[in-house]
Regions:
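Alpha-helical segment of the N-proximal tetratricopeptide repeat
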Residues: 3-29
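"A position-specific structural signal for the A-helix of alpha-solenoid helical repeats
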Residues: 9, 45-50, 82-83
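Solenoid-like repeat scaffolds
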Residues: 29-37, 69-72
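Alpha-helical linker/edge segments of TPR/alpha-solenoid repeat scaffolds
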Residues: 49-60, 86-91
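N-terminal intrinsically disordered, acidic low-complexity segments at the extreme N-terminus
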Residues: 66-91
């Protein structure tokens, strides 16, 4: 769990610096370890959604947000719904 926490922190730092590709590299290996229905799984998916938005890959961001609608944490599924409403809005 300590490695996961340090990876999440490193991904957050990468996001803060605008290094979206590094964030994706850090988070992708964790996706298989944590279900989208768990708190940590939701948290890491929200991070990678933000990174995908940052690099302009809205399709991947939308696909992941759809998986988070069923997360057990209301804050995570609410954030996913908010992001979907923004991503699905006409431009």
């Amino acid at each position: 769990m300590a490695n996961t926490a340090s990876a999440i922190k490193a991904a957050e730092v990468a996001l803060d610096k605008g290094d979206y590709n590094l964030c994706i590299q850090i988070i992708e290996p964790l996706l298989l370890s944590f279900s989208e229905r768990t708190s940590i799984g939701g948290q890491i998916r929200l991070l990678i959604v933000t990174a995908y938005i940052g690099i302009g890959d809205e399709k991947k961001a939308i696909d992941i947000c759809h998986t988070l609608i069923n997360n057990k944490e209301s804050s995570i599924h609410q954030q996913a719904k908010q992001l979907l409403s923004i991503l699905d809005a006409p431009s």
